[in-house]
C-alpha cells in the first residue's frame, strides 16, 4: 500500500475529520512515508503505522516518537487483531474489507480515484457510519517571471465515517 506521501494540506483535512483526543489510539493503514502518523503522533496516546513493507523513510521519520509502533502487516489483519479509536486508510487495496472489520469511532479513507471513494462511501453507508466525502483541491505557489503562480496538487477524496 505504499505510495506517494499524503500532502500536508490533505493531512490537515484528515485531522479535522478524525479529531483525535489525547487518550486515543490511532492507526495509519498504508502508512507509506509515515507523514500522516508523524502528524498525528503528538496528539494521541499511541499511534500504529501499518504497511505491508515499512519504508526506510517512514522508519527514519517516526523513530523519534515513543508512542509510535511500526507494524509490517496487512491492514485487514491489523484490524482483526487491534481496536484503534481513529483510523486513517491511505491505501486502496482491500478498503471495503477493512471497513467491514473496522470498529473505530471515526475512520477516513483517502482516495485519488472516484471509484475507490464511492466504494468506501457505499461500504460506510452499509455500516451506518458514512458522513461525507470531501474533495480536497489545493495549489501551491511557485516563482514565475518575477511573480507568483500556482501549481495544483492532485485532488484527493477524503471519505469520512463516524459512529
Curated annotation (Swiss-Prot):
Belongs to the methyltransferase superfamily. Archaeal-type CbiT family. Pfam families: Methyltransf_11. It comes from the Archaea. The keyword Disulfide bond does not apply. S-adenosyl-L-methionine binds at residues 6, 30-34, 51, 75. It catalyses: Co-precorrin-6B + S-adenosyl-L-methionine = Co-precorrin-7 + S-adenosyl-L-homocysteine + CO2. GO terms for biological process: anaerobic cobalamin biosynthetic process; methylation. This is Probable cobalt-precorrin-6B C(15)-methyltransferase (decarboxylating). Its EC number is 2.1.1.196. GO terms for molecular function: cobalt-precorrin-6B C5-methyltransferase activity; S-adenosylmethionine-dependent methyltransferase activity. Gene3D superfamilies: Vaccinia Virus protein VP39.
Amino acid at each position: 500500500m505504499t505510495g506517494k506521501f499524503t500532502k500536508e494540506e490533505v493531512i490537515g483535512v484528515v485531522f479535522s475529520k478524525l479529531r483525535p483526543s489525547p487518550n486515543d489510539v490511532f492507526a495509519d493503514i498504508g502508512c507509506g512515508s509515515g507523514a500522516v502518523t508523524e502528524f498525528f503522533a503528538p496528539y494521541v496516546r499511541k499511534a500504529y503505522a501499518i504497511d505491508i513493507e515499512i519504508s526506510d523513510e517512514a522508519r527514519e521519520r517516526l523513530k523519534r516518537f515513543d508512542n509510535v509502533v511500526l507494524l509490517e502487516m496487512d491492514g485487514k489483519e491489523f484490524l482483526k487483531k487491534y481496536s484503534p479509536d481513529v483510523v486513517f486508510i491511505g491505501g486502496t487495496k482491500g478498503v471495503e474489507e477493512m471497513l467491514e472489520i473496522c470498529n473505530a469511532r471515526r475512520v477516513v479513507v483517502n482516495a485519488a480515484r472516484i471509484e475507490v471513494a464511492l466504494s468506501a462511501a457505499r461500504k460506510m453507508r452499509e455500516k451506518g457510519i458514512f458522513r461525507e466525502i470531501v474533495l480536497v483541491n489545493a495549489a501551491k505557489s511557485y516563482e514565475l517571471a518575477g511573480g507568483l503562480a500556482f501549481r495544483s496538487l492532485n485532488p484527493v477524496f477524503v471519505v469520512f465515517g463516524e459512529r
